[in-house]
From Swiss-Prot, chain A:
This is Actin-related protein 4. It comes from the Eukaryota. The lineage of its organism: Eukaryota, Viridiplantae, Streptophyta, Embryophyta, Tracheophyta. Residues 48-73 are annotated as: Disordered. The keyword Heme does not apply. One of its GO terms (molecular function) is structural constituent of cytoskeleton. GO terms for biological process: chromatin organization; long-day photoperiodism, flowering; pollen sperm cell differentiation. Transmembrane segments: none annotated.
UniProtKB/Swiss-Prot annotation, chain B:
Pfam families: Profilin. The keyword Cytoplasm applies. Binds to actin monomers and regulates the organization of the actin cytoskeleton. Can increase the critical concentration (Cc) of actin assembly in vitro. Acts as a downstream effector of the hydrogen sulfide signaling to regulate the assembly and depolymerization of F-actin. At high concentrations, profilin prevents the polymerization of actin, whereas it enhances it at low concentrations. Binding to the poly-proline motif of formin induces oligomerization of PRF3. GO terms for molecular function: actin monomer binding. Keywords: Actin-binding, Cytoplasm, Cytoskeleton, Plant defense. This is Profilin-3. SMART domains: PROF. Residues 24-36 have a biased composition (Basic residues). GO terms for biological process: defense response. It comes from Arabidopsis thaliana. Induction: Induced by hydrogen sulfide. Down-regulated by treatment with the flagellin peptide flg22 elicitor. Belongs to the profilin family.
Length: 441, 168
């Protein structure tokens, strides 16, 4: 049994959109930064920005070709590094379809969190890693291997995101509705464990809504200019004219990353879930809301304020947004939030369904969208069985809602009764990575 | 029910000790006993109902996959044939028990994540059950607070792995 009382554990929640990391026992993560990474292939760039870079220059003969390619990449991690444009820098995500597909990127993200953000020595702190509810056994073992072999942590535990969210609200049983950046996942938690077979997931998350808004604005002729792409010229005292700056070596992925940052802020500032299903006629004459872009342009946004968030409830709306045609095949199989909730509960044992309906927990950054809670509750009351007493719960504090997974991990790793649960380094050395399945069920 | 073969156990133990595998695999340590005392009940009493960091299973058993009782602790529930069949079905087709719950002697457990065709885990309040499938048997461990799920898993699955390595 690992004696973890001496030093604070580190809690890491690597989501598809942002990574949250910090000390157990605290009420918010100390580090929050993008989960995407900038990568420049194969060149030795003459960058002075040494603090934010890491060069994986150690090639080995045994590596595969793609690994050799990866080892020549120059990687840039963190908000500060990502805010600086570089020629030929692609923006990559370590996570695909909710599962890690590039462990080298994960490794760099962890290293950034430990060394650059928290400034800790991982050999001194037990690590609590949050993981998606449908994480595979291989993924868990790979994470354990990396933690023990590379970072040489003294102990490790892996806990599922919805369990941690449930824990953060003091509940052993709940239905967690996690509207994150990359996806939306509904998970029943019973007595502190995910009921695996009833987990329901959809690729519609905050980033998808941002893309809907971006395409909608572009279809109206609005140009979203990242800061690096324009300069302002004073043509008359107090009057400025915006001129596009041509930087041909900027990658499309980096341009999109920057545009998403801007449009994501628009979305967070003005979007509001409509009380009833959106339709164009009802919203054609509503007053507009103003938003000033970085280039000085002022947008007047009307129907999109309500249309875009309603995608969470009526995914077919996506078909009406110009530029979103590439999702035409995917959208028909995606269900709205209330249906996902009912689908998940219906896959659970009949004896606990009533309890789940009365403890629906909202989590994730996208769940903080205005009126989402009220709309979900209303739709569920209308469509759920008559015997169900629907109650949708959400922290009034947006920080708590956004970081509920991390906060649950912070609480869990601080508990005295949790200390006997750590998967210790000596257990790893004796039994190997597969032991994680037994230690962290 | 097959008898524990002392000879094959000794051979298996020796071969394990000389294994060249870079990563040592877990195995229950078998105390040396006279041949006449070696029995399935010993596995239950000494290796399942043993002390784990001050905690102990509340009940344990080794059943044949046909439902026959090879050995069990005193308070292990009387399982019904349909309950065993449900467990075997869930090993074959994971997910069949989740909508109905896992029953042991009439007690209902909610099914949580296990390992396909290898482990079924159930939860009931602060306690629960772990069932490990071996070549011929099913190893059961039932626990309650303050024993943790991980501790129950270790005891049950370690013994199960040992039986599998012994061909049982």
């Amino acid at each position: 049994m690992y004696g973890g009382d001496e030093v604070s554990a580190i809690v890491v929640d690597l989501g598809s959109h942002t990574c949250k990391a910090g000390y157990a026992g605290e009420d918010a993560p100390k580090a929050v930064f993008p989960s995407v990474i900038g990568a420049v292939d194969g060149v030795e760039a003459m960058d002075v920005d040494v603090d934010s870079t890491k060069t994986n220059s150690n090639s080995e003969d045994s590596k595969t070709e793609s690994e050799k390619e990866k080892s020549k990449r120059k990687l840039y991690v963190g908000s500060q590094a990502m805010s600086y444009r570089r020629d030929h820098m692609e923006v990559l995500s370590p996570i695909k379809d909710g599962i890690v597909s590039d462990w080298d990127l994960v490794d760099n993200i962890w290293e950034h969190a430990f060394k650059s953000c928290l400034m800790i020595d991982p050999t001194e702190h037990p690590m609590l890693l949050a993981e998606p509810p449908l994480n595979t056994q291989q993924q868990r073992e790979k994470a354990a291997e990396l933690m023990f072999e590379k970072y040489k942590v003294p102990a490790l535990f892996m806990a599922k995101n919805p369990v941690l969210t449930s824990f953060a609200t003091g509940r052993a049983t709940s239905l967690v509705v996690d509207c994150g950046g990359g996806s939306t996942t509904i998970s029943p938690v019973h007595d502190g464990y995910v009921l695996q077979k009833a987990v329901v997931s959809s690729p519609l998350g905050g980033e998808f809504l941002t893309d809907c808004l971006l395409k909608s604005l572009e279809s109206k002729g609005i140009k979203i200019r990242p800061r690096y792409s324009f300069k302002r010229k004073e043509v008359r005292a107090g009057e400025f004219q915006v001129e596009d700056v041509d930087i041909p070596d900027t990658t499309e992925s980096y341009k999109l990353f920057c545009q998403r940052m801007i449009v994501g802020d628009i979305k967070d500032s003005i979007c509001r879930v409509p009380d009833t299903p959106y339709d164009d006629k009802s919203y054609s004459n509503i007053p507009t809301t103003s938003y000033e872009l970085p280039d000085g342009q002022t947008l007047e946004i009307g129907a999109d304020r309500f249309k875009v968030p309603d995608v969470m409830f009526n995914p077919s709306i996506v078909q009406t947004i110009p530029g979103m045609e590439k999702y035409a095949e995917m959208i028909p199989s995606v269900r709205g939030l209330p249906h996902m909730v009912m689908e998940s509960i219906n896959k659970c044992d009949v004896d606990i369904r009533r309890e789940l309906y009365s403890s629906i927990l909202l989590a994730g950054g996208t769940s903080s969208m205005q009126q989402l809670k009220e709309r979900l509750e209303k739709d569920l009351i209308e469509e759920s069985p008559h015997s169900a007493r629907v109650k949708v719960l959400a922290s009034g504090n947006t920080t708590e809602r956004r970081f509920s997974v991390w906060i649950g991990g912070s609480i869990l790793a601080s508990l005295g009764s949790f200390q006997q649960m750590w998967f210790s380094k000596s257990e790893y050395e004796e039994h190997g990575a597969s032991y994680i399945q037994r230690k962290c069920p | 029910m097959p008898l524990p073969h002392t000879h094959s156990l000794v051979v298996s133990t020796l071969s394990l000790e000389h294994s060249d595998k870079p990563q040592r695999r877990s195995r229950a340590k078998v105390k040396k006993k006279k041949k006449t005392n070696m029995s399935w009940q010993t596995y239950v009493d000494d290796h399942l109902m043993c002390d784990v960091a001050g905690n102990r299973l509340t009940a344990a058993a080794i059943l044949g996959q046909d439902g026959s009782v090879w050995a069990q602790s005193n308070n292990f529930p009387q399982v019904k044939p349909e309950e065993i069949q449900g467990i075997k079905d869930d090993f074959t087709t994971p997910g069949t028990l989740a909508p109905t719950g896992l029953f042991l002697g009439g007690n209902k457990y909610m099914v949580i994540q296990g390992e396909p065709n290898a482990v079924i885990r159930g939860k009931k309040g602060a306690g629960g059950v772990t069932i490990k499938k071996t070549t011929l048997a099913l190893v059961f461990g039932i626990y309650d607070e303050p024993m943790t799920p991980g501790q129950c898993n270790m005891v049950v699955e370690n013994l199960g792995e040992y039986l599998i390595e012994s061909g049982l």
